[in-house]
UniProtKB/Swiss-Prot annotation:
Main location: cytoplasm
Protein name (record): Phosphopantetheine adenylyltransferase
Phylogenetic placement of the source organism: Bacteria, Pseudomonadati, Pseudomonadota, Alphaproteobacteria, Hyphomicrobiales
Function summary: Reversibly transfers an adenylyl group from ATP to 4'-phosphopantetheine, yielding dephospho-CoA (dPCoA) and pyrophosphate.
Known partners and oligomeric status: Homohexamer.
Family designation: Belongs to the bacterial CoaD family.
Disulfide bond residue pairs: none
Binding-site list for ATP: S10, F11, H18, G94, L95, R96, E104, V129, R130, P131, I132, A133, A134, T135
Catalysed reactions, semicolon-separated: (R)-4'-phosphopantetheine + ATP + H(+) = 3'-dephospho-CoA + diphosphate
Gene giving rise to this polypeptide: coaD
GO biological process: coenzyme A biosynthetic process
Amino acid sequence: MQRIALYPGSFDPVTNGHLDVVRQAVHLCDRLIVAVGVHHGKKPLFSTEERLAMVHEVLEPVAAAAGCGFEASTYDDLTVTAAQKAGAIMMIRGLRDGTDFDYEMQLAGMNQTMVPGIQTVFVPASVAVRPIAATLVRQIAAMGGDVSHFVPAAVAASLKAKFN
């Protein structure tokens, strides 16, 4: 049986934190599905297509280098439902701090109640990427700040183009 993991998020934009999670997650599964959430009530900076392109450009090579299958997709329903539809046995969630942990534990409990066969696997962020949040990256980029320490080069270029 193939071990399929779903790594959900908005990826608006992809950060070095996301990259860190993927570097760890590819060793836990045979196939990693990075699922870009489409929330109709939110106005992301990057379109769904742009976010999918970033995911492919930045994250897919990490999976390939580790010999892990890779897929990027979108979803607009409950994350656990998307995982179930994808045939995933686990959902990958990155943890930066205690606030993330408290929220994610509550979510994991509810998800396990709804779909008992899917486990939530927590991946602790490496020290260097713990402070990185996509929201802060967007704010820094919008004000002309240098985000090169927080995102891959291709994403930094996309942010620069978006705000110029």
